[in-house]
UniProtKB/Swiss-Prot annotation:
ANK repeats lie at residues 18-51, 52-81, 85-114, 118-147, 151-180, 184-213, 217-247. Residues 248-259 have a biased composition (Basic and acidic residues). Pfam families: Ank_2, Ank_4. The modification Phosphothreonine is found at T249, T295, T297. This is Ankycorbin. It is found in: Cytoplasm, Cytoskeleton; Cytoplasm, Cytoskeleton, Stress fiber; Cytoplasm, Cell cortex; Cell junction. The modification Phosphoserine is found at residues 11, 281, 286, 293, 300, 304, 318, 327, 329, 340-341, 358, 511, 514, 666. Residues 282-299 have a biased composition (Polar residues). It comes from Rattus norvegicus (Rat). Residues 395-414 have a biased composition (Low complexity). GO terms for molecular function: actin binding.
Length: 978
């Protein structure tokens, strides 16, 4: 009984109780004092699991309560304790992003390399959560960075999958394996390309990620970048591949031959110009060598659904991707154009040819997607177009922009399918725009170079303290005028090209009027984007022209100042002061202009955003809206033309000013020194130019304010549009409700008037009744003494009732207390009953066990009885055998006697003696055997008796039970055999 009680006590300490519930609640609330008091009580443990497998220690880690952790550690909690899923407190703290808690656990010697059931460390969970501080703390405490979980992921792969770039950078800086693979063979670079994180891709490439690695399905990083549809990542990878290819290729002639072969074998859409992709990889070469496989490969599930439901959106997205790639390619080509030597130019040609080949591949894929339904006849035309476009790009011709549209017009025959024609026209327009933009960029670069030269000349002139001769000044003035003329002519040529492009766009818009409403809307949207791009380029050109003009004016003012300095010949210090003041003024002006230009650009971007929102909010009506969009486009083109005319006027004015300046210079050359009055006049002119510059600044500010006003107006329009679109229905509802309310109010007024009339009649009646009642009351008034007596009697009754009420309240409280006591007694009785029931259940279990033991003992007794019966049978058999043996002995004796009698007569004495001895020996042996059998039988009977007694007493050994069971089975087998 004592051992049973001890067992019950041990089980009670491990069971969940109220203190454990309170401990969980205190940890949930972060009450460290209550946690300390509860842990001091018996039975409460911080690592005890509840029904869900939670513990108070792990809950504190999930909540990040550091004070509770300190209290638990002082009470001797096991820091390495795990919950039902194998998570330690360190894992849970990292999972929930609590760096302070992690730091404390590591200080209390919690192992940083501990692993849960999934093979993950705390660093895996910190990387998945994206907590940079937690990752830093774990790395400082030497948590394994390249340890893989059951899925084959290291913390770097987990951070990339969850899109935490900062954690990725930190892990890479602390020695994470860049080329580590998961179970599917995917590297960190592949996962970063799939998630579309350009920063992480760049960091991985810098850390030496291998771009040629392939996963278990044979896909490389480029494939995953195409899945994410991120053009920036694709261009990054392609540029890296091209760099690696350039480093690896020993000779450039072989590469040139390979590219020329590929470009001759290739067929596809018209090629986009000056694309930066790298030389083709061996996988792409295999794809190119089998064009049938490219065209016959089916699209994936997502792509087929996309093209089936929204083909127009797919076309527009592909065109936009091409534009992005073209913009990237122009930047790459501009950077490549800086090469000067012949060897570098040859390298540049090889690179450009490789990039052209890769672009044709990409364009072919896009065209196959867009023209899946178009007839096969268009493929030959498109291949001819791509071949022609590649040749025109690679041929060194001076007039590229003029040759391209004619070649496209010759090489592109009319196709029956409308989608094919629209895409081809768009490609042609985009090519023309890109060419014109490229030429504009070149010219702007040349103008900037000229400006730099002018600035250098000015600086050299400033450094010279000696006075300049009039001849040198005139030469500088003539050089400036020539340069200004050159820049003006270049600018006019660029503007003419822009105008021609705009006219071509107009013609393209007019030619597409016969198409369907949806195609019109798509074309108008595309041209909208092109016009916006042109607008931006025009504005840049305008701003640069204004800057050029301002620079020219500055140069003129500086020249005038130098001439004045020559006339007056002031000291070098005064010159330097003047120079510094003018430089500071010019710098301030430039800063203000740059600031205003930035604000102007921001305002324009906001206007574009508002226009886009307005377009998205306006209802789309196919034919009417296309006409409206065309009108707006025409207006925008007219505005652009106006701006161009204004620019040309500005340049003419600048030219006129230059001519005036030349005339003045020629007059000044006549005389060696400038007169004081003339000097004052020149000062006046410089002040005028300054005022003009300030006026231009004010104009810029006014333009900026106008743009801001336009912005506010557009915002108001958007708000008004939103309010009207939402509140028209509400307004109608309000009007209807107001009308109904007015009708109801009118009806109520009528009813109220009627009610008033009735009430006035009732008031008159009541006044009459009041007068009558007053008269009756005056007749039936009670005297004051009787009234006071009644009041006293009523007060006494009220007091008595109040006393009774108090007594009843007291009785009620007593009854409540008795009820509470009864309830407590009932609850105690219930608890006792539950305890008794548990004891009863335990006793019943013991009784059932004893009954089972009793049944087993009865079965064993029955078996022993059977064994005793068999033993009695064996004894009887033995008795029978003994009797038979005695009979045989008697027979032998008789035979001996007979033989002894015969021996005297027949044989000699020797033989008789020998036979007698033999027989005697046999008899002795038989007697010995009989004695041994009796002994064995007695021993067996005694053993059986002992075992029967033990079985009756319930003290039989297990070995004996096993032997008895074996005997019973043997007896059963013998009976079955019989």
């Amino acid at each position: 009984m004592k051992s049973l009680k001890a067992k019950f006590r041990k089980s009670d300490t491990n069971e969940w109780n109220k203190n454990d519930d309170r401990l969980l609640q205190a940890v949930e609330n972060g009450d460290a004092e209550k946690v300390a008091s509860l842990l001091g009580k018996k039975g409460a443990s911080a690592t005890k699991h509840d029904s869900e497998g939670k513990t108070a220690f792990h809950l504190a880690a999930a909540k990040g309560h550091v004070e509770c952790l300190k209290v638990m550690v002082t009470h001797g909690v096991d820091v390495t304790a795990q919950d039902s899923s194998g998570h330690s407190a360190l894992h849970i703290a990292a999972k929930n992003g609590h760096p302070e808690y992690i730091k404390k656990l590591l200080q209390y010697k919690s192992p940083a390399e501990s692993v849960d059931n999934l093979g993950k460390t705390a660093l895996h969970y910190a990387a998945a959560q994206g907590s940079l501080q937690a990752v830093q703390v774990l790395c400082e405490h030497k948590s394994p960075i390249n340890l893989k979980d059951l899925d084959g992921n290291i913390p770097l792969l987990v951070a990339i999958q969850n899109g935490h770039s900062e954690a990725c950078h930190f892990l890479l800086d602390h020695g994470a394996d860049v080329n580590s693979r998961d179970k599917n063979g995917r590297t960190a670079l592949m996962l970063a390309c799939e998630t579309g994180s350009a920063n992480t891709v760049e960091a991985l490439i810098k850390k030496g990620a291998d771009l040629n690695l392939v996963d278990s399905l044979g896909h490389n990083a480029l494939y995953y970048s195409k899945l994410s549809e991120n053009a920036g990542i694709q261009s990054l990878l392609l540029s890296k591949i091209s760099q690696d290819a350039d480093l690896k290729t020993p000779t450039k002639a072989k590469q040139h031959d390979q590219v020329s072969k590929i470009s001759s074998e290739r067929s596809g859409t018209p090629k986009k110009r000056k694309a930066p992709p790298p030389p083709i990889s061996p996988t792409q070469l295999s794809d190119v060598s089998s064009p049938r496989s490219i065209t016959s490969t089916p699209l994936s599930g997502k792509e087929s659904v996309f093209f089936a439901e929204a083909p127009f959106k797919a076309e527009i997205s592909s065109i936009q991707e091409n534009k992005d790639r073209l913009s990237d390619s122009t930047a790459g080509a501009d950077s490549l154009l800086d090469v000067s030597s012949e060897a570098d130019q040859q390298d540049l040609l090889v690179l450009l040819q490789a990039k052209v080949a890769s672009l044709t591949l990409h364009n072919k894929e896009l065209q196959d997607k867009l023209q899946a339904k178009s007839p096969k006849e268009t493929e030959a035309d498109l291949s001819f177009q791509s071949f022609h476009s590649t040749q025109t790009d690679l041929a060194p011709s001076p007039s590229k922009s003029s040759d391209i549209p004619s070649s496209d017009a010759k090489s592109s025959p009319p196709v029956e399918h409308p989608a094919g024609t629209s895409t081809a026209d768009r490609d042609v327009i985009i090519q023309q725009l890109q060419d014109t933009l490229h030429d504009l960029q070149k010219r702007l670069e040349t103008s900037e170079a000229e400006k730099k030269q002018l600035q250098d000349e000015l600086q050299s002139q400033r450094t010279d303290t000696t006075c300049l001769n009039n001849t040198e000044i005139s030469e500088n003035g003539s050089d400036l005028s020539q340069k200004l003329k050159d820049t003006q002519s270049k600018y006019e040529e660029a503007m003419k090209e822009v105008l021609s492009v705009q006219k071509q766009m107009k013609l393209g818009l007019l030619s597409h009027e016969s198409a369907d409403g949806d195609s019109r809307l798509r074309e108008v949207r595309v041209t909208d984007e092109d016009v916006d791009a042109l607008k931006q380029d025009l504005q840049r050109a305008l701003e640069e022209s204004k800057r050029d003009k301002a620079r020219v004016q500055e140069l003129e003012t500086k020249l005038v100042e130098k001439e004045k300095a020559e006339a007056t010949k002031p000291s070098s210090e005064v010159c330097e002061e003047m120079r510094n003041s003018y430089c500071s003024v010019i710098e301030n002006m430039n800063k203000e202009k740059a600031f205003l230009f930035e604000k102007y650009q921001q305002a324009q971007e906001e206007i574009m955003k508002l226009k886009d929102t307005l377009k998205s909010q306006m209802p789309q009506e196919a034919p009417d809206d296309s006409g409206d969009m065309k009108e707006t486009m025409n207006r925008m083109v007219d505005e652009l033309n106006k701006q161009v005319s204004e620019l040309s006027q500005l340049y003419r004015e600048a030219q006129a000013e230059l001519e005036d300046y030349r005339k003045r210079k020629s007059l000044e050359d006549a005389t060696e020194y400038i007169h004081r009055a003339e000097h004052e006049r020149l000062m006046h002119l410089s002040n005028l130019s300054r005022t003009k510059a300030e006026e231009s600044l004010s104009d810029m500010r006014s333009q900026y304010s106008k743009v801001l006003n336009e912005l506010t107006q557009l915002k108001q329009l958007v708000d008004a549009h939103k309010e009207n679109s939402v509140s028209i229905t509400e307004h109608l509802e309000v009007i209807t409700t107001l009308r109904t309310m007015a009708k109801e109010m009118e009806e109520k007024t009528v009813t109220l008037q009627e009610h008033l009339a009735s009430k006035e009649g009732e008031v008159a009646k009541l006044e009459k009744q009041l007068a009558e009642e007053k008269a009756a009351m005056s007749d039936a008034m009670v005297p004051k003494a009787s009234y006071e007596k009644l009041q006293a009697s009523l007060e006494s009754e009220v007091n008595a009732l109040a006393a009774k009420l108090k007594e009843s309240v007291k009785e009620k409280e007593k009854a409540h207390s008795e009820v509470a006591q009864v309830r407590s007694e009932v609850s105690q009785a219930k608890r006792e009953k539950e305890n008794i029931q548990t004891l009863l259940k335990s006793k019943e279990q013991e009784v059932t066990e004893l009954v089972q033991k009793f049944q087993r003992a009865q079965e064993e007794l029955a078996g022993l009885k059977r064994c005793s019966e068999t033993s009695s049978k064996l004894e009887e058999d033995k008795d029978e055998k003994i009797n038979e043996m005695t009979k045989e002995v008697l027979k032998l004796k008789e035979a001996l006697n007979s033989l002894s009698q015969l021996s005297y007569s027949t044989s000699s004495s020797k033989r008789q003696t020998q036979q007698l001895e033999m027989l005697q020996q046999q008899v002795k042996q038989l007697q010995n055997q009989l004695a041994e059998c009796k002994k064995q039988h007695q021993e067996v009977v005694s053993v059986y008796r002992m075992h029967l007694l033990y079985a009756v007493q319930g003290q039989m050994d297990e070995d004996v039970q096993k032997v008895l069971k074996q005997i019973l089975t043997m007896c059963k087998n013998q009976s079955q055999k019989k």
